[in-house]
Amino acid sequence: KTMKIIKVNILLCLLALVLGSCEDFLESRDKGQVLEEKLFVNKEGVEEAMYGLYYTIGAGELWGAQLPTIMDALAQYLTLGTYSTENSGGFEELMLHNHESERSTTLFGGIWTLGYKLISDVNKILENLDSWGYKPLKHMDLYRGECLGIRAFMHFELLRMYGSCNLSKRGIPYVNNYGMWVTPFSTTRECYDKVLKDLNEAHTLLLEDENLLTYPRKPVNAYDQFTSYRELHMNLYAVKALLARVYLTRNEPGDVDSATMYARQIVDSKKFPLPTGANVGPDHFIRMMSGTVAQDEGIWGIYKSDTYSALQSLFLLEKGSFLAADEKMYEELDPARGTDHRSNWIRVPSASTPEVSEKLGMRLMKLINASVFNTANKEQAPIGYSGSNIIRVPELYLMLAETLLEKEPTEALRYYNEFISSRGLNTEESITKEDVDKQFWREYLQEGQYWFRLRRRQVPEI
């Protein structure tokens, strides 16, 4: 692959389409964002507060746009178009690893500040649930499980960004109480222990999702909306995926086996199938993630009604937007290896006129709703609910290919081949860890995950 070689000190602490009534419900929950005491008197108030958490996760500073783009800038996925703009300048500094510039610290500071605001809001909800004195709540376990899962998730993301890889050195503050007092920093090891404690409790509380989250997905329950759209909630399978991530990243004795166990539980549940047959083609890959939570592969995503506007300024401006650092990253030099349909994630947009398309040139289109960009592209309308993906099942297939490579190479190859065949590539007879790395690099463009893989693997340069 062609990538700009830049020395990186990895140990640096870096700062849908559903019935109208259902869409109306999703729109209304998208607005729940302010926690007030008056909310915590009935289930409607609690659920409004819960939806407020997801609104924050989908904010522009977090998974709505900036956080994945920042991570991709660090991972050298991106290059800048003809002109730098105020919008792009901070990311440009990150691509050059100027972490201490004012623009860089502003971007990192936005994640840190809003991340801890989210954690504070979670703790506020948990405090009220723990002291609940009103009519019993039918979904108390779901509420608490989702809160604990979100708290662990946000702390783990902050730890991966800002904490030391050395378990005995400074991590981040792990805040598990609501209040104005200052929480001291924990070591990285202590942070992992607290993340796992929250995730294990969440796992127990969310076991109802074994029946609520099925494949094919259940119809919307109009009488109990909170148990619908479970892939848009912190659900049991998202917690399993996070447990797998955390164990693999910590990498203490026995952790790889634990990561493998949880990854297998998700993949073998068959609730998040990869495309097969006629679905393995350009049309599917143009539509599957274009501003939507992947309908089948999405384990957890955030509903967000303004996905297009949040991403258009980053990737579709004529001047000053980000381009792919390697436009040929999906190219297979040997035709016998098949056609990687993910190549449709970097393409010339179908604009209103050929002249406009030519001006734009090759663009990062994986997350762009082509039917909003040009209403004539109706056949390219996305599949699924409008929003952002946070966890998708390919990560678990590739994790299994990595963790089983030495102990169970036949199984590792099976999971790897299932994955690459779903992308249009022909199966392999043997694989290496570098093959898995390459597929992860190809798969997680624009999702902010590849940088974390590099950091975990302690890669000295990219």
Predicted regions and their residues:
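Bacterial Sec-dependent N-terminal signal peptides
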Residues: 1-31
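Membrane-proximal, proline-rich intrinsically disordered regions
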Residues: 22-73, 304, 462
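Inward-facing hydrophobic residues that define packing positions of alpha-helical scaffold repeats
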Residues: 50, 119-122, 192, 199, ...
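Conserved, well-structured interaction surfaces
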Residues: 88-162, 181, 185-190, 199, ...
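Hydrophobic-face positions in mid-chain alpha helices that act as interaction patches
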Residues: 95, 233-234, 248, 256-389, ...
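Acidic interhelical loop/turn segments
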Residues: 130, 134-139, 204-235
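Short coil/turn linking the two alpha-helices of tandem helical-hairpin repeats
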Residues: 159-166, 210, 249-253, 406-408
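Long, intrinsically disordered, low-complexity segments
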Residues: 194, 429-462
